[in-house]
Curated annotation (Swiss-Prot):
<dbReference type="GO" id="GO:0006357">
    <property type="term" value="P:regulation of transcription by RNA polymerase II"/>
</dbReference>
<protein>
    <recommendedName>
        <fullName>Mediator of RNA polymerase II transcription subunit 31-A</fullName>
    </recommendedName>
</protein>
<dbReference type="InterPro" id="IPR038089">
    <property type="entry name" value="Med31_sf"/>
</dbReference>
<dbReference type="GO" id="GO:0003712">
    <property type="term" value="F:transcription coregulator activity"/>
</dbReference>
<comment type="similarity">
    <text>Belongs to the Mediator complex subunit 31 family.</text>
</comment>
<keyword id="KW-0010">Activator</keyword>
<comment type="subunit">
    <text>Component of the Mediator complex.</text>
</comment>
<dbReference type="InterPro" id="IPR008831">
    <property type="entry name" value="Mediator_Med31"/>
</dbReference>
<keyword id="KW-0539">Nucleus</keyword>
<keyword id="KW-0804">Transcription</keyword>
<keyword id="KW-0805">Transcription regulation</keyword>
<dbReference type="GO" id="GO:0070847">
    <property type="term" value="C:core mediator complex"/>
</dbReference>
<dbReference type="GO" id="GO:0016592">
    <property type="term" value="C:mediator complex"/>
</dbReference>
<dbReference type="Pfam" id="PF05669">
    <property type="entry name" value="Med31"/>
</dbReference>
<comment type="function">
    <text>Component of the Mediator complex, a coactivator involved in the regulated transcription of nearly all RNA polymerase II-dependent genes. Mediator functions as a bridge to convey information from gene-specific regulatory proteins to the basal RNA polymerase II transcription machinery. Mediator is recruited to promoters by direct interactions with regulatory proteins and serves as a scaffold for the assembly of a functional preinitiation complex with RNA polymerase II and the general transcription factors.</text>
</comment>
Length: 128
C-alpha cells in the first residue's frame, strides 16, 4: 500500500478543519453533545484527541482565537473527565466557570491597563 502525499490544498483544508474543530472544544455544551453521543468512548476518536495536542505548540497555538480550547483538549486526555461530560450539569459548571474567568480577567486587565497608562503619564510629565 503506497503512502499518498497530501497536496498543498489538502494540507490547507486539513489545517482549517482541525483549527475549527479544536476551537469548538472550548464550548462545554459541544463537549456534552459529543459525550452524550458516545464519541469519547470511541478509541479512534480518543486517539484523535491525542493527535490534536500538537495545537499546543506555539507555531500552531498562535492561530487560536479561543485559547481555553487547549485546556479542554488537555482535560479530554483523561478518561474521568470524558465520562463526566455526559452529565449536562458538568458542562453547565464548566460554562459558568469560564464566564467567571472571563469577567475576572477583563476587570483585571482593565485595571492593569489603567495603571500602566497612569505610570506612562507620570513618566511623561516628570521627564519634561
Amino acid at each position: 500500500m503506497a503512502a499518498t502525499m497530501e497536496t498543498d490544498e489538502q494540507q490547507r483544508i486539513r489545517f482549517q478543519l482541525e483549527l475549527e474543530f479544536v476551537q469548538c472544544l472550548a464550548n462545554p455544551n459541544y463537549l456534552n453533545f459529543l459525550a452524550q453521543r458516545g464519541y469519547f468512548k470511541d478509541k479512534p476518536f480518543v486517539n484523535y484527541m491525542k493527535y490534536l495536542l500538537y495545537w499546543k505548540e506555539p507555531e500552531y497555538a498562535k492561530y487560536l482565537k479561543y485559547p481555553q480550547c487547549l485546556h479542554m483538549l488537555e482535560l479530554l486526555q483523561y478518561e474521568h473527565f470524558r465520562k463526566e461530560l455526559v452529565n449536562a450539569q458538568c458542562a453547565k459548571f464548566i460554562d459558568e466557570q469560564q464566564i467567571l474567568h472571563w469577567q475576572h480577567y477583563s476587570r483585571k486587565r482593565v485595571r492593569l491597563q489603567q495603571a500602566l497608562a497612569e505610570q506612562q503619564q507620570q513618566n511623561n510629565t516628570s521627564g519634561k
